[in-house]
Amino acid sequence: MNIAELLNQNPTPSDVALIDRSKKPAPEVSVAEITNQVHVFAQAMVDLGLTPGSRIGLLAGNLGEYYTVMFGAPAAGMVFVPLNTRLPESTLQYIIQDADLKLLITDVSHAEFSADVPKVVIGSEQWGEMMGGAPASNTMDVEPDDVAIQIYTSGSTGKPKGVLLSHENVTFTVLEYGAALPGEVMLVSAPLYHKNASMASKLAFASGGKVVLLPQFSPGEYLDAITEHRVTMCSGVPTMYALVTAELQKAPDRHDLSSVQRVLIGSAPLTEALFDDVQALFPKALVTNGYGTTEAVLEFGPHPEDLPRPKISLGCEHPSVQLKLVDPDTGAESDRGELWVKSKGVMLGYHGLLEANAERLTDGWYHTGDLMHRDEDGWYFFVGRVDDMFVCAGENIYPDSVEQMLERHPSVHQAVVVPVRDELKGQLPTAFIRSEAGVQMSADDIKEYALKNGPAYAHPRHVWFVDEIPLASTAKIDRTQLIKNAEKLLNLDTEVQ
């Protein structure tokens, strides 16, 4: 099945499926209208002389036309390449060259972006002419393993890698999950170049749900959208919900969140304290800890015997997916180790990177790089990134484990642990702490708590208190920047007590 044919799965194509709040007033669009625009775009690509397999890039924020390109390129048998608008220009230029783009589509805010490929700006006269033509008569026939999407990693630890997702990779996930979502009103505020936002949209359009699309996240707009459109399902990262909570406290009677039935938290480790905060924000909702990788799309599902889900569990092995935990050092399977995934959702590989493919793919198994624990009931829990692990005096330290311990302190709102170089022990753990509002703490308070509640070798040797934690372009904690900050602070001998 072609990705674009997911639109044909919608049981009520004439009903409103998209409320596009990137425009004022927000237009309401049906799947039938989206489908027509998708086929017009597909035919326009053919008329431009582009052939199946050609890479079509999109550098844009959230707007309704995003879906035209997202579905339209694959509808013509071409490959959709979403570009992260938060990446520096040099990185974007690298991606454009690496992907060998044949056409770049941008929104107005990126109209001045210079690239050595043909470019069309959404809303321009050229775009209008292109979208004023006749629709393609049909969707291009594809093989299950034909590439549909080439989405790039953030490149936080090197050059971005192009993840090759086939039509089957994506349609498999949508068809597995979509049956449970008819009638849902989904709030999409994360960038559509991220997997979670684009996948949520595909699920809604295929199942008969509705997408309320925000141009970008802002806590006030987020709350307004929930209230105005009676949103039933939303997702976000922990920092988003912290901002939403603060915004709600300014005018608690202005917003009605009672319509929300499902809340998914993802892209960062979840503590029980944060879980409780989000549950208090949406008291009628089922709050779940979400997990997903760009490379594997689908991993977890409910318990096969319908056991109640522990607060911060990621779920159990999905019935259409194989999971195993592999010890990174010995290669043996156990109840604690690196998560490996095998399913129809696992990527074809990284574009042009044979060495990376050999490291991450083994006989169809994708090595996620995420350390997990599985309990006796089959529930999986996130422990940390294998790559984030560091060694202090011969002892392996997983930052997430130390952070979870520190965040159990009643005065700690958020903790991030990173290593710094040390001549004697190799690396030492350090911590950046966000305290609860109005609380005064000292570095010694944190160190003493860590020594009492965890192994001595893992306690942070240096502690700094900060107002906010830097985020990378993926909205995840920017550990690389924090390591630089820690080393700078130590070199200047400016540890904050």
What is each model feature region?
Residues A17-L63, Y67, F71, P88-Q93, ...:
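Conserved AMP-binding/adenylate-forming core of the ANL superfamily
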Residues E28-A32, A148-F172:
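Conserved AMP-binding A3 loop
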Residues T171-V185, Y193-M233, E247:
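Conserved AMP-binding/adenylation subdomain of ANL enzymes
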